[in-house]
């Protein structure tokens, strides 16, 4: 069995939301701590109960759960994206968008508007993921 990944903490997600809110002048306010706690644990549940070791799937689970939790007053989608990337980076996987950053992120964010499925999100991560040092 593969060693357990490094998980993203609730505190790290709160800090990411604070940064995102500051960038846009939106309020940083955690309005549902319980929902955020559950969302942050979602990839662990996928790892343990579904025995899914695919990091694109784990990142997708985190992104979908945090965005869906709507635990913050603002910036939930941007925070979800950064947390998912943070999960990958904590496990020595980079998301290397190169010169395609704006277009690639626009495509991913179509999930939040119902124009990209969860499978599409996982495929997006698989397309742009690279193990650190091998990108």
Predicted regions and their residues:
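FIC/Doc superfamily catalytic core
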Residues: 1-135
């Amino acid at each position: 069995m593969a060693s357990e990944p490094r998980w993203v903490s609730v505190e790290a997600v709160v800090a990411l939301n604070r940064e995102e809110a500051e960038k846009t002048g939106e309020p940083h306010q955690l309005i549902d701590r319980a929902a955020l706690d559950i969302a942050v644990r979602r990839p662990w549940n996928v790892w343990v109960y579904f025995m899914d070791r695919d990091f694109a799937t784990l990142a997708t689970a985190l992104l979908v759960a945090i965005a869906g939790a709507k635990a913050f007053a603002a910036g939930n989608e941007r925070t979800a994206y950064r947390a998912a990337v943070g999960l990958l980076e904590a496990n020595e996987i980079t998301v290397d968008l190169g010169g395609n950053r704006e277009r690639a992120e626009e495509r991913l964010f179509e999930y939040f508007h119902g124009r990209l499925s969860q499978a599409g999100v996982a495929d997006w991560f698989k397309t742009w993921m690279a193990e650190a040092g091998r990108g």
